[in-house]
């Protein structure tokens, strides 16, 4: 337990940010992290004091740790035969403010072919625009309507475009199914034998994050988009996915992680009653991670990894973490503390991480550094107010 974490716990208890009656007591009586793995100490026991040492030694160590123990090893990076084709003619929409593109991102694999369908609304602008890529884990018909007859706050494309960003999304099950028995379909059988999976083979979250990188491949070919200013965003299991996407693909300038909980932003070594654990997800969603992750179920405090280390892989790029005050399963304070404990990685580059003296109250945000955190009042969801927080944060970097 570090002195920093002790101070954070004390500040949180004193601040008591959750004042509404009826909420579980754990929200204002936080336990301390136990056996927290070191961020800036190498496997050989050497302290990391420079960005060069971080990139040369410690960052690769942490990346491999999460590949082997959490998300699994990908059998492929950028695939062969990658191609992009319009599935419908371009169309001017949103009262003349945007161009719609529907793009088939196809690829060839040793055992077949695959395709990811991307939907994009590009602002009509004089110069290339920044963009947000949503990993959509909610029904396509309701949330990704290309005609915009059906709209939701989950993907508020009109509002995104009005802020000067391209709104881009893909449906996660284009890449891999979201079910425990889905390894015989999607991308998995294209690159391996589903009947001969090992404990370190990639799980669904890694496959979905791989899909986000393929959308990024397309963005790099679209001259109306600024490929140096792309944010990846996801909610819940999509938030777990966006964090892994941002950690593994340095082309994403901003990584937005919304209500992601265990396996996403929340610390495993912080025991919170009513919050997801590795043991719970091992039984409820065994396909999300590699099989090796499950060995830490019920032994979370012994795990040699934790999510502050994963967050640090995004440094020195931008990272934004969002929580909801009533999202007990995700464990908001654990998400906040993870971001705080990841901040020293940004400091190696002479940048500030999360600038915050205490856990914010519901409705507040901390966005002064390169790492943003906000706490929305409400339930587990991705709302327009969350999007506005993420766009506000990205706006600041666009103006520099």
Sequence positions of predicted segments:
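C-terminal catalytic histidine-bearing segment of alpha/beta-hydrolase fold enzymes
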Residues: 293, 340-400
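Mobile cap/lid helix-loop segments that gate and shape the active-site cleft of serine hydrolases
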Residues: 187, 257-310, 335-356
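Primarily recognizes the serine-hydrolase "nucleophile elbow" in alpha/beta-hydrolase
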Residues: 139, 143-145, 213-276, 284, ...
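N-terminal pre-domain segments of enzymes
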Residues: 11-73
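N-terminal cap/lid segment of alpha/beta-hydrolase-fold proteins
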Residues: 73-131
């Amino acid at each position: 337990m570090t002195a920093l974490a002790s101070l954070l716990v004390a500040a949180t208890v004193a601040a008591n940010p959750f004042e509404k009656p009826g909420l579980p007591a754990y929200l204002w009586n936080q336990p301390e992290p136990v056996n927290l793995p070191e961020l800036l100490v190498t496997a050989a026991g050497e302290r990391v004091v420079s960005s060069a040492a971080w990139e040369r030694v410690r960052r690769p160590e942490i990346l491999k740790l999460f590949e082997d123990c959490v998300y699994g090893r990908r059998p492929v990076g950028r695939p062969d035969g990658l191609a992009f084709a319009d599935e419908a003619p371009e169309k001017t929409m949103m009262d003349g403010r945007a161009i719609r593109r529907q793009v088939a991102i196809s690829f060839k694999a040793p055992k077949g072919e695959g395709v990811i369908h991307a939907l994009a609304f590009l602002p009509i602008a004089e110069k290339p625009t920044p963009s947000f890529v949503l990993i959509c884990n909610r029904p396509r018909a309701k949330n990704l309507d290309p005609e915009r007859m059906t709209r939701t706050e989950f993907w508020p494309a009109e509002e995104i475009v009005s802020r000067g960003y391209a709104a881009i999304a893909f449906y996660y099950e284009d890449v891999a199914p979201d079910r425990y028995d889905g390894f015989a379909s999607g991308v998995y059988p294209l690159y391996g034998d589903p009947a001969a999976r090992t404990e370190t083979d990639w799980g669904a979250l890694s496959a979905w994050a791989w899909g986000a990188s393929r959308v990024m491949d397309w963005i790099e070919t679209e001259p109306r988009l600024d490929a140096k200013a792309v944010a990846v965003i996801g909610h819940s299991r999509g938030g777990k996915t966006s964090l892994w996407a941002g950690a593994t693909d340095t082309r994403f300038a901003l990584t937005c992680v919304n209500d992601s909980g265990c396996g996403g932003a929340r610390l495993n070594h912080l025991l919170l009653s009513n919050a997801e654990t590795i043991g719970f997800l091992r039984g409820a969603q065994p396909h999300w991670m590699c099989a090796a992750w499950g060995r830490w179920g019920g032994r979370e405090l012994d795990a040699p990894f934790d999510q502050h280390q994963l967050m640090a892989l995004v440094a020195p790029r931008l990272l934004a973490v969002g929580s909801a005050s009533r999202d007990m399963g995700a464990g908001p304070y654990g998400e906040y503390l993870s971001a705080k404990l990841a901040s020293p990685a940004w400091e190696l580059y002479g940048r500030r991480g999360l600038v915050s003296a205490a856990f914010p109250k519901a409705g507040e945000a901390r966005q002064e550094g390169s790492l943003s955190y906000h706490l929305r009042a409400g339930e587990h969801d991705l709302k327009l107010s969350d999007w506005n927080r993420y766009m506000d944060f990205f706006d600041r970097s666009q103006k520099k």
